[in-house]
Amino acid sequence: MERCGWVSQDPLYIAYHDNEWGVPETDSKKLFEMICLEGQQAGLSWITVLKKRENYRACFHQFDPVKVAAMQEEDVERLVQDAGIIRHRGKIQAIIGNARAYLQMEQNGEPFVDFVWSFVNHQPQVTQATTLSEIPTSTSASDALSKALKKLGFKFVGTTICYSFMQACGLVNDHVVGCCCYPGNKP
């Protein structure tokens, strides 16, 4: 079975590619988790974050925004010592700050899911790339999403991270045409 060329032989990576990446996500809390995790990969590989995902979930209350937003500096101090996650103070603080920004959006009547999906007109965008080199690392939509998230107070949401988030959550489907997960290729 052919997969996208970025997938290694790691079973965790294969399962992620086959079952999650590019699948449209419409749960606001899951989208919150993914924007936070995508920010953790800045300067690193996604597999590094993926291998630590369960630890992140444990450390950040299953990404419950209310509980994460209530975390304090003593929590940050504890987490920078936790080898189960990426021990970057700024990235840890970003998750907490992002939870606060997320809650502010929700309190203002804008569900995160509606906000995020508005950047693709609430419709998954399917590329028709035949090779990885044809897949962009950012687009005008990820530029706009990044700018809007930053304006709302989100951190670690540059355009490349936003595009990775859009790919991961199925706002765009960048499986290459020959991949088993490309639309229409799955049995």
Where are these regions (language model features)?
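HhH-family (HhH-GPD) DNA N-glycosylase catalytic core used in base-excision repair
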Residues: 1-187
